[in-house]
Structure formats: structure tokens, C-alpha cells
């Protein structure tokens, strides 16, 4: 969905990403390549972890747009890894709305695929999802 912001008149591109229990609502705004997550700079929010920051910027780097758009994120739930992956999916989806030509390279890299893996539920009679009590033969 493309929305023109009333106060600045700039086009804003939206994308939502999910991973495990994390949800990220991402806005791409023409700018200088800043990452703002929940009102904090991205490197501070993700604890200066280059891996998380690389994951998030990967779709932009694939298309050569690293310093052309600011990424504004509202992330909730999960941990930092789930949030970083959900932001990546949101950025990729927003880039598809920006230009439909962006879709094939992003799809080839796997950035538009939602990771279906989630925590397996605990079963009764077991300690965890699969961990059984110690077996005693006698």
C-alpha cells in the first residue's frame, strides 16, 4: 500500500513481516538509509550486532538501494533474531510495492518467503515438546 504522508508529501511504502512470534510493521521513506526501530536507532536497538543489521539491509543491498530509503519499524514480540527476520520480510514486501520489477530478484534470494518454523507445542506426558522422562528398564 502506498500512502502519501500529509506533512511531508513523500511517498511511504508499507510492508508487514512475521517470524516466530515477532511482528514488524515496516515503512520505507525516501531518505539517507537510516534504520529506526521503535523510535531508537537500529544499531542501538539490535545491540550493534552486524549480523542482525546485515539481515535487515540485505533486500536493499540486493537491489542496490542501501542509501536511498529510510526504514522506520514498529517491532513487537519475540526476540531480536525473530524481529530482525520479520523486519527483513517487511522491507522486502515494501520494496515490491515500490516497484513490481523488484519482485523477481527478491524472490530468487528468498526474501519474500515467510519462514514457517515456529515453536512446537508441549505434549502431556513429556517434559517439553519432545523431551521424555528418563526411562528405567527395572
Swiss-Prot record:
Q: What's the source species' lineage?
A: Bacteria, Bacillati, Cyanobacteriota, Cyanophyceae, Nostocales
PANTHER family linked to this entry: RIBOSOMAL PROTEIN S9, SMALL RIBOSOMAL SUBUNIT PROTEIN US9M
- Source organism per entry reads Nostoc sp. (strain PCC 7120 / SAG 25.82 / UTEX 2576)
- What GO molecular functions are on record for this protein? RNA binding; structural constituent of ribosome
Asked if the keyword Metal-binding belongs to this entry, the reply reads no
State a single Pfam family of this protein: Ribosomal_S9
Which residues lie within the region annotated Disordered? Answer: 100-138
- Please provide the record's keywords in A-Z order: Ribonucleoprotein, Ribosomal protein
**What GO terms describe the biological role, i.e. biological process, of this protein?**
translation
Basic and acidic residues compositional bias, start-end:
100-118
Similarity comment text for this entry? Belongs to the universal ribosomal protein uS9 family.
The name under which this protein is listed is: Small ribosomal subunit protein uS9
Task: Please name the InterPro entries in this protein's record.
Answer: Ribosomal_Su5_D2-typ_SF, Ribosomal_uS9, Ribosomal_uS9_bac/plastid, Ribosomal_uS9_CS, Ribsml_uS5_D2-typ_fold_subgr
Source gene?
A: rpsI
Question: What is any one of the record's Gene Ontology cellular component terms?
Answer: cytosolic small ribosomal subunit
Sequence ranges of Basic residues compositional bias? 119-138
Does the UniProt entry include the keyword Transcription?
no
